[in-house]
Amino acid sequence: MSTTAYPDTILIIDFGSQVTQLIARRVREANVYCEIVPFQSADEAFKRLQPKGVILSGSPHSTTDIGSPRAPQAIFDAGIPVLGICYGEQTMCAQLGGNVESGHDREFGRAFLDVQEDSPLFAGIWAKGTRHQVWMSHGDRVTSLPDGFTIIGTSPNAPYAVIADEKRKYYGVQFHPEVVHTPDGAKLLQNFVHRIVGVKPGWTMGAYREQAVEAIRKQVGSGKVICALSGGVDSSVAALLAHEAVGDQLTCILVDHGLMRKDEVQQVVEMFREHYNLPLILVDASDRFIGALEGESDPEKKRKTIGRLFIEVFEEEARKLGGADFLVQGTLYPDVIESVSFTGGPSVTIKSHHNVGGLPERMKMQLVEPLRELFKDEVRLLGKELGLPDSFIGRHPFPGPGLAIRCPGGVTREKLEILREADAIYLDEIRKAGLYDAIWQAFAVLLPVQDRGRDGGWPHLRIRLRLARGDFGGRHDGGFLPLRHEFPRQCGHPHHQRSPRHQPRCL
C-alpha cells in the first residue's frame, strides 16, 4: 500500500492471475503510477486512491461459479474508464447485465485477432480489417453483451474478443495484452492509460527520488540509521537514497560471509567508500559462516543457517555502534504484493528480507523502506538516476545465501573457490558473446560429481559444473535463451584452466 498520494493513479484489481504484476509493469513503463490490490480490499483501495482509471485482471476463477470474485460496484458508478482483461472482461459483462458461459472450446496460447472496428484502444497499432497475434488463456466466454457495448475485435474461438462501450469508456479484452506473446499489448495498455483515461506520463524515477528523500527525512528526523548492505542492487539503491536524505546519520554494514561472487566484496567497498563517501563497516565473518556450513547438505537448512548467522553478526556490529533507531531495508513492491493471500484475505504483515527478518523487533528499530513502491526494473532506473554505474545496475540477480545454494552438499573453501572461478569464467564468456544484458540470469552450479584423468601427463581431478541461464530480457514470461553448441566448450577452453598442479580441472 502506497504511503504517498499520487494524483494520477491507475488501480489494478487482482483476481488471482499469475501475470497481474506484468500489467502493473506495463503501466509503469508508460510512466504512469499504478497499484495492485486484491479483490477483497478493492472497495477500500478505490476510496483511498481515487484512481483515474481501473484495470480488472485475469483469474483462475470462473464467473459462472457461485461466489466468484467481483469488482466493487462503486467502480462502475464512478464514471471512470475501466479495462477488463480476460476474467476482468467476463466479470464486467456479468455485473453489467451481459452473460458469460463455460466454453466447450478452450483457447490457450497464440491466437489471431480480427479487428472489426477502429477504436481509441487500437490507435496507432491496429486498424479495422487487420489481423494480429494475441495470447489467449480462457475457458469461459462472453455470450451476450450488456447494453451500450459493441464488438470491436473477434477471434476464431472468441466472438467477443474485444468489446467496448465507448460512451462510458468501458473496454474488455479476452486476451492478455500484458504478456510479450501479444506483441502490441504494451502499446494497447498505453492507449488505455494515456488516450482513454487521459493520464499524462508523469511517473519518473527523478520525481520519485525527490519524494523518497523527503519521506526519509520526515520519518527519520535526527535518529540514527543503519543499513545491511549486501552488495546487491536493492540494498545499494536504498542505502544511497538514505544517505542522500540523512547523510552521516546513516552507517552501512557489509557482512562478508565468504559466499559472494568473485571480487564482489572489494568492488562494493571501493565504490561506496571512495566514490560515494558512504560510512561503511566491513565485517569478515567468512570463517564463521563456512565453518557452520561445512557439513550441511540440505539447501533449506543452509539458507536458515546463513540467515541466523547474518542476524547474529549484524546485531553484534550494530550494538558496537550503540544501536540505532531505524533500519533501512530494500523491500520491493513485489514483496508487498506477494505477502497478500487471495484465499484468506490480505496479510497484516509484510514479508521481510530474508537476511534481516526479525532484526527490527529484536533491536526495537523502525523500518525505512524507500523502495517498497518499485519493481526491480524501476529500482535499476533509480540506481542510474543516483549515479550507479551501468555495470553494477545491470548485474544478474544473486541469491541471498550466495554460492552456498549453488554448491550441493557440504560447503568448503575449496569448493567455493572452484565455483567462484567457474562462475566468473562463464559470465566473462557471456559478456564476450554480447549476451549478458540479454539474459536475465546466468550462473554456474558445482555438481557433486568427480572423476579422474590425465592432461599432458599431469594427473588431475575433474570437477563437473552445470552452466545455467534464465529467461531473456528480464521478462519472466519468456523462455530460455538458446546458446550455440560450442559455447560450453569455450568456457572450458584451456586458457581458462588453472595448472593441474594447483587446481582441479572443471568441465
Swiss-Prot record:
ATP binds at residues 230-236. Residues 203-395 form the GMPS ATP-PPase domain. The gene is guaA. GO terms for molecular function: ATP binding; GMP synthase activity. Residues 9-202 form the Glutamine amidotransferase type-1 domain. One of its GO terms (cellular component) is cytosol. PANTHER family: GMP SYNTHASE [GLUTAMINE-HYDROLYZING], GMP SYNTHASE-RELATED. It catalyses: XMP + L-glutamine + ATP + H2O = GMP + L-glutamate + AMP + diphosphate + 2 H(+). Pathway: Purine metabolism; GMP biosynthesis; GMP from XMP (L-Gln route): step 1/1. Keywords: ATP-binding, Glutamine amidotransferase, GMP biosynthesis, Ligase, Nucleotide-binding, Purine biosynthesis. This is GMP synthase [glutamine-hydrolyzing]. Catalyzes the synthesis of GMP from XMP.
